[in-house]
Design a protein with these regions (language model features):
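Vicinal oxygen chelate
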Residues: 1-6, 28-115, 126-127
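Polyanion-binding surface elements
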Residues: 9
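Short glycine-/small-residue motifs
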Residues: 121-124
Length: 127
């Protein structure tokens, strides 16, 4: 049996606010998507990233939002270190919380961490 990652979903409180963050990160999200309860973007690698304001309410009525610590760590790869620095500066300059400024990891990757509007820490990586 072969298992493959097909989709990653983010439950969001405010679709427009969340999509604005991910557009600034560099994702190509349709401009008319801000008022939708569910938005999907298929990435170049075939994985679909989706945002949803209604799924949890409709299919898991007893769901309680998680608290404390990482809920998940979506990671986005950029072309090079300069792109990581520029994207981090753009996002934090727009008021998004910089979780950790760009740094080199022990395994040679260059990354930064920024919190999206729903509290998910997003990794921005090159290398």
């Amino acid at each position: 049996m072969s298992v493959q990652l097909s989709m990653v979903g983010l439950v969001v409180g405010d679709m427009a606010r969340s999509l604005a963050f991910y557009r600034r990160l560099g994702l190509d999200i349709p401009a008319d998507a801000d008022d939708r309860p569910h938005v999907e973007v298929r990435m170049a690698n075939g994985v679909t990233l989706f945002w949803d304001t209604a799924f949890a309410k409709a299919y898991d009525p007893n769901r309680e939002p998680p608290s404390g610590g990482y809920r998940m760590l979506p990671e986005f790869f950029l072309a090079d270190r300069g792109a990581v620095d520029a994207t981090y500066a753009t996002l934090t300059g727009r008021g998004y919380r910089g979780h950790r400024a760009p740094f080199e990891t022990a395994f040679g990757a260059y990354m930064a961490m920024v919190d999206d509007p729903d509290g998910n820490t997003v990794l921005i990586t090159a290398g």
